[in-house]
Amino acid sequence: LHVLGMFLPSFFTGSLIARYGVLRVMFAGVALLTGHVLMTLTGTEFPSFALGLVLLGVGWNFLYIGGTTLLTTTYRSSEKGRAQATNDMTIFAVGLACSFGAGALLQTFGWQTLNMLLLPWLAVAALAIAWLGRRRQHPQAALAD
């Protein structure tokens, strides 16, 4: 269910971004991941676990595709290969590093606590998205920052 949640929305995430804007889709991703955290607090029975994993996957998809979409606006055409390769390498290297510690963290803190630790990161993401939205709405104010 989690993997389906991660990749199945890719068929329509681009359309959602085109229709509603990348920042709104990314905010939806933050909301879905927050829903995932709240769902984990209801228990580890199968329905809670399954719905939580779907929310996690779709939220990840909206943020990942949204972030990749934003990345394409930050470099010149001549920098495309290097920028995308650096982005992919960073994502996969961080994922690899986190994979090595995941079991120990789960054993030490437990499922619900690990998910709760996601909340500050989601708050940072929401603030960053809001800041970017403000910069896009008020370009002159952004120049003064």
Feature-to-residue mapping (PLM):
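Helix-to-loop junctions at the C-terminal end of transmembrane segments
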Residues: L8-V22, L106
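Helix-breaking motifs and short loop linkers at transmembrane-helix boundaries and internal kinks
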Residues: G21, T42-T44
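Structural signature of the two symmetry-related core transmembrane helices
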Residues: R24-M39, L119
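Paired small-residue
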Residues: H36, P47-L55
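Intracellular juxtamembrane helix-capping segments at the cytosolic ends
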Residues: F62-Y75
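A late C-terminal transmembrane helix in Major Facilitator Superfamily
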Residues: E79-Q107
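A membrane-interface helix-boundary motif in multi-pass transporters
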Residues: A104-A123
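Multi-pass alpha-helical transporter architecture, strongest
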Residues: L119-D145
